[in-house]
Amino acid sequence: MSSKNKELLWQSRFSLPFDRDALRFSSSVHVDKALYREDIQGSIAHVTMLAEQQIVSHEEAQAIIAGLQEIELELRDGNIVPHWEDEDIHTVIENRLKEKIGAVAGKLHSGRSRNDQVATDTRLYLRRNIGSLQAALSELLTVLLQKAEHYCDTIIFGYTHLQRAQPISAGHYYMAYFTMFLRDRDRLQDLLKRVNISPLGAAAFAGSTLPLNPARSAELLGFEGIFSNSIDAVSDRDILIEFLSDCAMVMMHLSRFAEDVILWSSYEFGYLEISDAFATGSSLMPQKKNADIAELVRGKAGRVYGNLMAMLTIMKGLPLSYNRDMQEDKQPLFDSTETAINSVTIFSKMLENTRLKEERLAKLTSEDLSLATEIAEYLVQKHIPFRDAHRITGKIVSWSIESGVALPHIPLEQFKSFAAEFDEGIYACLKADASVRAKKTHGSCSFESVKQQINAAKERI
């Protein structure tokens, strides 16, 4: 179905038909057709309110609602194929409604502009997809919690500057990402408070002379409140930008996590194994096992960042109130929504099918310079000022590297040559599991602390 050769919704004021190339250029139906459910949902609420306010008759409202419900099914089943000459999805639906029920279809738009119509559609879309992204994040949080529990007693290297820093519980590592993604989910929940405000009834930007009841429209659509200023209701896209920012934050965290997966699964690190079901090979090099899913997630973060910058740039400098520039908000919104949800979903599945190489990690962490901090803190407990302890430990590390003797195997006499305070107790500090277990501070990497973090996290899932 197409509205080819039909008058555009706004065309009656003009003496010449809209240039076809201009129409093709300005048409958005290929993008905003994704809003057809929300558009019909908003229209049904609007016409219900119109009938209750006696602006249209109940019989007219029933005919309009029945027609809209049929059109929704036609669009869902692909029986209506929007054409660029339809201009936008609102035009597609209204023209099809007119074909079905005649002139009464024209009453649907009473007291409504495409400005508040599309603002309503967008908020309904955001509300639905915020829920979808939160659900995907909840699944990822569940996987992270499972990993943290399973590997709570496994020791890995903690890194700073991509240099081995200190031994930590692997569970602590997974709980770090759990905490990040939990904040991402919480941010989306907070955004819902601002999204869940209905702009329907603001009309073009100045309101209407008809006795509309915006509160009733909002109630029918499940909104928690209504707009306070009709100009603001149709002319800002800050909630959309905030959502894109939240998506960018999610993708930033995923990208960092993906980088760890890529590095740790490499031959050089060899800490982590990705399931064959989530890896690819090379068309030339038979030995390759590539972390392509993680790489794609890392790459898609750039797209989502770009969408955020695109929206900020589109809105920069626009005079109040509505401007056609805002039509360009749909592609960034739809792309970031789909990318974020799909990335979180596939990353969760991939992560669930990874395993840490515990034997290799145990060997690597047992004789590594990452225990140097334990030496410094041992000296602090011997009442040596930390700066002096740091300097002494640095010299011990240099000697260890030059002599080729691992820290746990340095003779006591050699330790004493650096500081007389050393005694046999130093060797108890130079074990990775003892180092992790000895941590005493809140939120630390000790096994006990990680278990506390896990138990607290279970309450948030």
From Swiss-Prot:
Reactions accelerated catalytically: 2-(N(omega)-L-arginino)succinate = fumarate + L-arginine
Broad class of the protein's primary localization: cytoplasm
Keyword list, A-Z: Amino-acid biosynthesis, Arginine biosynthesis, Cytoplasm, Lyase
One record GO biological process: L-arginine biosynthetic process
Gene Ontology terms: cellular component: cytosol
Pathway where this protein functions: Amino-acid biosynthesis; L-arginine biosynthesis; L-arginine from L-ornithine and carbamoyl phosphate: step 3/3
Gene3D superfamilies per UniProt: Fumarase/aspartase (C-terminal domain), Fumarase/aspartase (Central domain), Fumarase/aspartase (N-terminal domain)
Molecular-function GO terms, alphabetical: argininosuccinate lyase activity
Family the entry assigns: Belongs to the lyase 1 family. Argininosuccinate lyase subfamily.
Protein name: Argininosuccinate lyase
Organism: Chlorobium chlorochromatii (strain CaD3)
